[in-house]
Amino acid sequence: MSSIDPATFAAQFAQIEIQPFKQRYQLQTNTYQSQLSALGKVESAMREFRTALNEMNSSTNSIIKNSTSISQEGYFTANADAKALSGSYQIFVEQVATSHQVSTGMPADLDATTEIPKTGNLEFTINGKTMTIDLSTVDTDGDGVTTVSDLTKAINNNSDNPGVNATLVRSNGQTHFMLSSTETGVANQINVSATGTGQAWFEDAFTNLSQISAPQDAVIWLGAEKTGLKLTNSSNTFEGVIDGVDITVTKAQTSGETAIGLGIGADDEATKEQLNKFVDAYNTLISTIDEHTQIGSEDKKRGVLASDPTMRSIESQLSSLVRGEHGGMRLSEIGVTLDRHGKLKVDQEKFAEAQKNNSAGLEAMFNGDGALLDSMDAMAEPFLKFSSGAFKSRKEALQANLDRLSDKQTTLERKYDMSYKRYLKQFTQMNTLMTQMNQTMSMFG
């Protein structure tokens, strides 16, 4: 009668006891991990889709694109948004807006270390806003000396600064204390006075200002000079002078010159590109969802999220929005429809016709509050909230399941250890008994 290996037998018998549970727990773990991974991929795809929506639905960007053409470059630029209507205009640039720049009447031997009074106030008023510099607070480094350099920092860094920059400029061997308004236009003229310092040279310096650049507004004529509509603006950018069009002037024309032509029209290619971006973003999201929710067939594996209610809700809401009415129109009316796979396809000829005949209607359908892109963004938000979104809740639930399975597997390992020790003891005893029997039998051999 041959002996046995107690350790091998103990391991085999202990493994048999836990094997059904081990296989079940591992299968469940694999399922939950696959679902967790799939949810992460869908969530990522949905965030990318939402980013694309926001990029096409902002104050500076939309689905519908218009373009501008200018007959003579160098005097102004123009930007037309989706609301702009096609048309031709004449623009004459009389003057550009400039900011106010002055040089103070500081002494000729001024430099950055020149000391200034430690008492009194320096007051600035620009466009109705006032800033008062208390000269006793200008010495921020605490060295007991207040310098012109300290004053420039105090002016520029003051939280109440109404729009003025102070700089020290060196020219022809002399340092000048300069003040410049940060905004253009007559309204942004710099008014400054120094009082209570007890030092006339300092107060006179802010009374005797040398003007380097006068503040002026931008002036254009919508039409010919002197006979068209005169428009004045403190900034060089005239926003919405023509509905949906911003004009930025860069150089003044000479009086008597001919007005410059401005043309506004639909940018068919840019609009087509934007529409295709929207369609591609939508279809990419649907493809990602479909990859993980497919029912399964002979040649396709069932998706790990095939019965997931969150996925069904997303697809249902997206489909409803695509088929719904927005701004009095439906996507199907302009050649954008769903195919049998739930993805968007575009009839380019039908869309081009809609763009030609009703660009304003297209803009109202796609962009703006409550329009299609805004509605899709609002639909996605509850799913993607970092604190309480549906994806977060689903992933937390799956992770909780994985944690419970991990605890069960730990318990199973303890059970294996206990069974192994029990079987090892039993098989060791059996092996000892078999050895004794063999020895007894050999005595009669």
Curated annotation (Swiss-Prot):
**GO terms under cellular component:** bacterial-type flagellum filament cap; bacterial-type flagellum hook; extracellular region
Self-association state and partner proteins as the record states? Homopentamer.
Protein name per UniProt: Lateral flagellar hook-associated protein 2
> Cellular location of this protein?
Secreted; Bacterial flagellum
Classification from the root reads: Bacteria, Pseudomonadati, Pseudomonadota, Gammaproteobacteria, Vibrionales
Q: Would the keyword Cell membrane be found if you checked this record's keyword annotation?
A: no
Query: Beyond the main fields, what else does the record say?
Result: V.parahaemolyticus possesses two flagellar systems: a single polar flagellum propels the bacterium in liquid (swimming), while multiple lateral (peritrichous) flagella move the bacterium over surfaces (swarming). The polar flagellum is synthesized constitutively but lateral flagella are produced only under conditions in which the polar flagellum is not functional.
Q: Name one GO biological process term.
A: bacterial-type flagellum-dependent cell motility
The role this protein plays is: Required for the morphogenesis and for the elongation of the flagellar filament by facilitating polymerization of the flagellin monomers at the tip of growing filament. Forms a capping structure, which prevents flagellin subunits (transported through the central channel of the flagellum) from leaking out without polymerization at the distal end. Essential for swarming motility.
Gene encoding it?
fliDL
InterPro entries found in the cross-reference section: Flagellin_hook_IN_motif, FliD, FliD_C, FliD_N
Q: Which Pfam families match?
A: Flagellin_IN (PF07196), FliD_C (PF07195), FliD_N (PF02465)
Write down the species: Vibrio parahaemolyticus serotype O3:K6 (strain RIMD 2210633)
Signal peptide positions are none
Q: Which residues form a coiled coil?
A: 388-423
In terms of domain of life, where is this protein from?
A: Bacteria
What family does the database annotate? Belongs to the FliD family.
What does the UniProt keyword field contain? Answer: Bacterial flagellum, Coiled coil, Secreted
Please indicate if the UniProt record lists Secreted as a keyword.
yes
